[in-house]
UniProtKB/Swiss-Prot annotation:
SMART domains xref list: ZnF_C2H2
Zinc finger (C2H2-type): 271-295, 304-328, 334-358, 364-386, 393-417, 424-448, 454-478, 484-508, 514-538, 547-572
Keywords annotated in UniProt: Activator, Metal-binding, Nucleus, Repeat, Transcription, Transcription regulation, Zinc, Zinc-finger
Keyword Iron: no
Primary localisation category: nucleus
Region of interest (Required for interaction with ZXDC), ranges: 271-577
Region (Disordered) location: 1-91, 120-140, 218-260
Protein name, as recorded: Zinc finger X-linked protein ZXDB
Coiled-coil annotated residue ranges, if any: none
Originating species: Homo sapiens (Human)
Lineage: Eukaryota, Metazoa, Chordata, Craniata, Vertebrata
Pfam family name, one: zf-C2H2
InterPro entries xrefs: Zinc_finger_trans_reg, Znf_C2H2_sf, Znf_C2H2_type
Reported function: Cooperates with CIITA to promote transcription of MHC class I and MHC class II genes.
Amino acid sequence: MEIPKLLPARGTLQGGGGGGIPAGGGRVHRGPDSPAGQVPTRRLLLLRGPQDGGPGRRREEASTASRGPGPSLLAPRTDQPSGGGGGGGDDFFLVLLDPVGGDVETAGSGQAAGPVLREEAEEGPGLQGGESGANPAGPTALGPRCLSAVPTPAPISAPGPAAAFAGTVTIHNQDLLLRFENGVLTLATPPPHAWEPGAAPAQQPGCLIAPQAGFPHAAHPGDCPELPPDLLLAEPAEPAPAPAPEEEAEGPAAALGPRGPLGSGPGVVLYLCPEAQCGQTFAKKHQLKVHLLTHSSSQGQRPFKCPLGGCGWTFTTSYKLKRHLQSHDKLRPFGCPAEGCGKSFTTVYNLKAHMKGHEQENSFKCEVCEESFPTQAKLSAHQRSHFEPERPYQCAFSGCKKTFITVSALFSHNRAHFREQELFSCSFPGCSKQYDKACRLKIHLRSHTGERPFLCDFDGCGWNFTSMSKLLRHKRKHDDDRRFMCPVEGCGKSFTRAEHLKGHSITHLGTKPFVCPVAGCCARFSARSSLYIHSKKHLQDVDTWKSRCPISSCNKLFTSKHSMKTHMVKRHKVGQDLLAQLEAANSLTPSSELTSQRQNDLSDAEIVSLFSDVPDSTSAALLDTALVNSGILTIDVASVSSTLAGHLPANNNNSVGQAVDPPSLMATSDPPQSLDTSLFFGTAATGFQQSSLNMDEVSSVSVGPLGSLDSLAMKNSSPEPQALTPSSKLTVDTDALTPSSTLCENSVSELLTPTKAEWNVHPDSDFFGQEGETQFGFPNAAGNHGSQKETDLITVTGSSFLV
């Protein structure tokens, strides 16, 4: 049985003297409805008190006791035996029962169960000396506070004399046995084993019995063998005076009430957490049990575990587990009662949260037209229709009904439709790319035209770009701006571009998503850049005329002719008109296309025309000269094994009696305006000094007839150069020449036929010993040929020089 309005009053009695409260020692007030002449019905029960010498006590001792703090309420005494009398203070627990008409109030009979409590702060009459008995002359202190039970104003029907109630009262986490029988209140402390955790307190009926109404004598010691006689007092009924003003409680008694110090309001039994340094209180016992789980050894123990396999959820209460099981069963028993909603939820809490949305629905009302909206944002959007000006400009696209205030706003809106239709398309032949903005199309067109207006101004850089954004991105390299850091711990790498960081992050995943597309190659890579480097190995196996740049000093490979032309425009600054002439001239091919296929031998007349025929039109000469100057055309002839026609009479020590190797014209790296070439004979013992071949003397160059050479200067022992004509005689020093062929007038000449050769035959390459090798090379402006290498390869022993 629980009495919710029964509150403890706590005090401490100091000193070694008497301990009890004398009969009539404390004033109490009668309820307003109690008749004055009724027999005494109040009972003042002191459940615990000093057991050191009886009820008598001096006034000065009581006054001293009221000022000192004491141990906690109902705490088991360890420093003093229950029957001992010595010094020291002890706690007492005071209960004042005031039933109406001598009967016990009954719970559930129309009013709240239990008496209404009121705080008492008056001093009652005390005792003089050490004798017991009432002495109305001198007041004495009754402890820090008393509680008087005041009956409710309305009369309450009471049960008959034979009615009895029994139960347990828990006050500050301490259990007390309680029993009402025939108007008698019985309270007792459970046996010592009942305080153990989990043990239910045993009821002891009839432990402490107060005298019946109308008998103001104290209870006999034999009535309750467990408590001494000074713990039970009877008080006769007295007229209740007006309550005195409340005094502020001293010591720990002020912290007993649920609302701070004990007040006049109804009290609630609180359950205090027994753990040290916690101090939390709870209104219900099960709340305390849930709280105690947090103090268990496993910190947050959850004894209720979901029984379904693979779930693993645990909970502190069985209700939460039950609510969790509904989620497994897909049960949603709590449906929304709103009309047209139809939503259901697993818990009532979720339903209540959902219902708040219905309560706020259409709670925002427009002050102009009284229309309601569910949110403030929608209301604000609606209110603009009342206060904004007219919007005469409407979008003309089908399905779009938006209107605008100004024409510029309409045009800005139309760009959104243009982006959807992708109206900005590239007009370059063969390109079908489309863009949502004209500026992006303009940047794309620069990739076709080769225009790169944004130049890097860093010293020695020279890079240029099609857009400012790419230039700014490039400048991060110069500033070492590596703003994109790898987030993986221990990596520490940083990058200038976000896409580089994205590609690097794949390496931390341990996967290789980039696969080589070449059939039969199963290579995989974790980075796209590694795949690109690997793919170059496969490109070296394809025909080089389709992929290699025709510029002799450039070894870049390309997958299409279009990309190769784009490269020539961007890197080598070749104009579009020159590219068109290059495509139109079928005889002009890159140097890499010159293969080992030999042509038919020519007659003497054709050899003569090689040096004498000059074309009527100068267009071919201009084209060939432009190609040579730009470095596009490089003619590498591997060998020429021919004899020159005509009789060459001996001059001085020169004779034609011995065969000589044909001359070899090697390419150098000087600018094409003054082509420095070296004429070598096929033996290591004989060579000719380096001389200059002027571009003005070259009329036409082609693979077929090789054009016409106006003159080839010849230098003998005399410093005066003389022209080389078809009838001129070529005199060489035959003493140091190794015979390989005979120079006679009836010999048959061969065309300067091409053979397989490297891209650039450098003067230091090993061509000595290759019989019949003659190479013509026109260098480009990008190369550079050192004089040291030339002197190492040339040995001057002859007396004749070919200039």
